[in-house]
UniProtKB/Swiss-Prot annotation:
Keywords: ATP-binding, NAD, Nucleotide-binding, Nucleotidyltransferase, Pyridine nucleotide biosynthesis, Transferase. It comes from Pelobacter propionicus (strain DSM 2379 / NBRC 103807 / OttBd1). Signal peptide: none annotated. GO terms for molecular function: ATP binding; nicotinate-nucleotide adenylyltransferase activity. This is Probable nicotinate-nucleotide adenylyltransferase.
């Protein structure tokens, strides 16, 4: 079984998140894609301090009806900061025979060297790096810290990095939807429409709960 892991604050989840997950599922033949809201982001504070349960509910509403998409609340079940390597490790224990694919954006890949135990992430699962318009990764090896480069080989034809342990990093230019959660929060806070930026059921929930009514 191939399982995609897509983490994020999902504050809120929007149409580009869903499209990225669908393109990744199709590209790598994933059987399932798990959406994993971050409980306590390790690198920057959560904008607006939207509670974990509300962000989970927005994801739940957004993916309803898609049998390949699932919500995982695993990071809300652990104390402390939400580190990706811990989440990957838990799924590895739960699904020892599965192929895991960690889905991230190209901006996150370019900062991977700042992540906790980034080398173990590359060694323990496959990565799908989604390149947004204007954010291409032209030289993947050079983007990584020197101490890990010797374990990887880049194949231009397939646009992938192969780790000596067998895992791969796949790069693809996906999702032309240029949508940001921060812009959605700004629009919602000022009473502007967010229709077609988020699924209708998510928009209704945001309005009902007044989630971003006081967001900066």
């Amino acid at each position: 079984m191939k399982i995609g892991l897509m983490g994020g604050t999902f504050n809120p989840i929007h149409m580009a998140h869903l499209r990225i997950a669908e393109e990744a599922r199709e590209l790598c033949g994933l059987d399932r894609v798990l959406f994993i809201p971050v409980a306590d982001p390790p690198h920057k504070p959560l904008a607006g301090e939207v509670p974990f349960h509300q962000r989970c509910q927005m994801v739940r509403l957004a993916i309803a009806g898609n049998r390949a998409f699932e919500l995982s609340e695993i990071e809300g079940q652990r104390p402390g900061k939400s580190y990706s390597i811990d989440t990957i490790g838990t799924f590895r224990e739960q699904h020892p025979q599965a192929e895991l694919y960690f889905i991230i954006g190209s901006d996150s890949f370019l900062e991977l060297g700042l992540w906790r135990r980034y080398a173990d992430i590359l060694r323990s699962c496959n990565l799908i790096v989604v390149e947004r318009p204007g954010r291409q990764v032209n030289d993947p090896l050079s983007a990584l810290p020197v101490d890990i480069r010797g374990e990887l080989r880049y194949t231009p034809a397939s646009r992938s990095l192969e780790h000596v342990g067998g895992t791969r990093v796949h790069f693809f230019a996906g999702c032309l939807l240029d949508i940001s959660s921060s812009e959605i929060r700004r629009l919602a806070a000022t009473g502007r429409s967010i229709t077609y930026l988020v699924p209708p059921q998510v928009e209704a929930y945001i309005k009902e709960q007044r989630i971003y009514s006081e967001c900066p």
